[in-house]
Amino acid sequence: RSSASPHLFIKAVELIEQEGFISKAPVAERPSILAARELRSAFFTRAEDVSDWDVQREIAGLLHVDFDNILNKLKTGEAIARLTKDYDLAQLHGIEGSPTYVINEGRQKLFGNVSYGVIAANVNEMLASQGVDAASLC
């Protein structure tokens, strides 16, 4: 099994969002964000095979996204093209896994099981030093 199928599903939902077929919503409420959350929940809490199109179809239904539109993005190659761009960006920025946070224009990278405190310290340091040409203390 592969995680590529659920990633393609998310990319298809993103494309549909951008084309206006899904109403605009705040970031946390966008169908693509909710789809990613539902896929994680299905995988980690219910031990479902999220590469299975039936599972993805069910999630699309929960989110009121037409699964035929998703399939169209897969058939036309648009979803794989978008996912490939993400993979190319990951290589460019040296992303080796998830989660990875790239900050300070790529000069800092937080990878793996990083505590909220470490993330907050880095973000707060960046906000405090905006416009200052100095090295981060984090």
Model-derived segments and spans:
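C-terminal cap of thioredoxin/glutaredoxin-like
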Residues: 23, 27, 34-138
